[in-house]
């Protein structure tokens, strides 16, 4: 029921940021034929990898299903998968059963609800990848491969991380010396120019290279934070507060389990992303928080109550920081309909007229 409730919250959130673009695409898809949609995908360059969201929007548009139900579906699945891992962790590690309520809220608050709702693609992709890693590496179930494949179809940028996952599955390990060396090297030698050269040789379309370049050396590499207040910038970093203790716990974890190997391979990636691009750092954080939590709570030994309380505090502060960062969007949202009968909320939609009245073409709010 909680997953349904969060899905309803997603339906009532205003379409700003990337969500604005996806919503306007949905409206445009209502007028397209199958052939026109195929041509649109070829022009956009999204037909090779991350075609799942546009395809889903097209199908919903042609079926007359409001776009808000796409959001509901993504958020509902996100929380259902997260809660399934919580149940698996309680089963695998009875030592934390006595603190199951605290652990549950850690899992609940660790989900970056607002980031996933506003962007849809990447946030949902990393949840699918994290759950796929859990099933494939920890549970040794081949169904994990399906979730990994779906994650790549939602957002192509998770493909390099998926490659690390397979390296861990086939026995690649990294010790603390190499982790430390790579992290220090990232700060000393890595810069956007190096990444730009790497992007140039990647086997992806020119359009995808332009998008990736924007995250490395353009506006989204960090300049976007300058458009916001210092309080917003602090709130943005605090929303990933839970990642820092999880990084330390993973660094200290020397288990030979494939899941542990995968998480430890991600540690230098986090530092590399931070050295190159703030946006890349936030994005890898979206993956590291859930997968790091999965590793921590699946351990065979009894986890320290202090560590669990620490993670709970970090998770609560992270969620509160998200609420603060997106308080302006909340002010014009339809979240007040949560106090109405559920049928009212599920029938609520954001029309093109409402969007044009409240949101600029770049996805920013008209009234701040």
Regions found by a protein language model. Give the residues of each.
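Alpha-helical transmembrane segments and terminal signal-anchor/GPI-anchor hydrophobic tails
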Residues: 14-15, 20-36, 162-283, 327-356
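Short hydrophobic/aromatic helix or loop-helix immediately within or flanking a transmembrane segment
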Residues: 20, 24-28, 40-65
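Transmembrane-helix signature of polytopic, membrane-embedded enzymes
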Residues: 86-108
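Membrane-interface alpha helices of multi-pass inner-membrane proteins
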Residues: 112, 143-167, 272
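Transmembrane-helix motifs of polytopic, lipid-linked glycan transferases
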Residues: 73-92
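Membrane-water interface signatures at transmembrane helix termini and the short loops
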Residues: 103, 114-129, 154, 246-303
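Signature aromatic-anchored transmembrane alpha helix within multi-pass, membrane-resident enzymes
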Residues: 303-323
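Membrane-interface transmembrane helices that cradle and orient dolichyl/undecaprenyl
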Residues: 129-143
């Amino acid at each position: 029921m909680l997953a349904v409730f969060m899905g309803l919250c997603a339906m009532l959130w205003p379409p700003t940021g990337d969500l604005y673009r996806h919503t306007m695409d949905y409206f445009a898809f209502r007028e397209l034929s199958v052939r026109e949609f195929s041509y649109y995908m070829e022009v956009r360059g999204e037909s090779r990898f991350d075609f799942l969201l546009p395809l889903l929007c097209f199908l919903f548009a042609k079926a007359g299903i409001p776009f808000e139900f796409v959001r509901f579906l993504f958020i509902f699945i996100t929380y259902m998968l997260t809660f399934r891992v919580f149940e698996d962790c309680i089963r695998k590690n009875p030592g934390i059963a006595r603190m199951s309520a605290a652990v549950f809220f850690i899992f609940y608050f660790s989900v970056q609800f607002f980031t996933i709702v506003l962007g849809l693609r990447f946030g949902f992709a990393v949840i699918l990848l994290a759950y796929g890693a859990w099933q494939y590496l920890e549970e040794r179930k081949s169904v994990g491969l399906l979730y990994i494949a779906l994650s790549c179809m939602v957002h192509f940028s998770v493909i390099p991380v998926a490659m690390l996952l397979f390296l861990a599955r086939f026995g690649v390990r990294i010790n603390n010396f190499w982790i430390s060396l790579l992290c220090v090297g990232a700060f000393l030698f890595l810069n956007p120019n190096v990444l730009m050269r790497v992007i140039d040789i990647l086997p992806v379309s020119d359009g995808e290279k332009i998008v990736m370049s924007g995250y490395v050396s353009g506006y989204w590499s960090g300049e976007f934070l300058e458009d916001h207040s210092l309080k917003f910038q602090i709130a943005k970093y605090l929303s990933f507060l839970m990642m820092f203790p999880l990084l330390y716990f993973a660094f200290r974890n020397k288990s030979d389990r494939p899941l542990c190997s995968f998480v430890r391979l991600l540690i230098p990636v986090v530092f590399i992303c931070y050295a190159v691009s703030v946006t890349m750092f936030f994005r890898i954080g979206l993956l590291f928080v859930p997968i790091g939590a999965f590793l921590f709570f699946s351990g065979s030994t009894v986890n320290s109550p202090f560590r669990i309380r620490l993670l709970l505090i970090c998770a609560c502060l992270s969620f509160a920081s998200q609420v603060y960062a997106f308080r302006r969007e909340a002010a014009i949202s339809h979240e007040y309909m949560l106090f109405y009968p559920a049928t009212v909320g599920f029938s609520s939609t954001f029309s093109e007229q409402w969007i044009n009245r409240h949101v600029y073409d770049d996805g920013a709010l008209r009234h701040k």
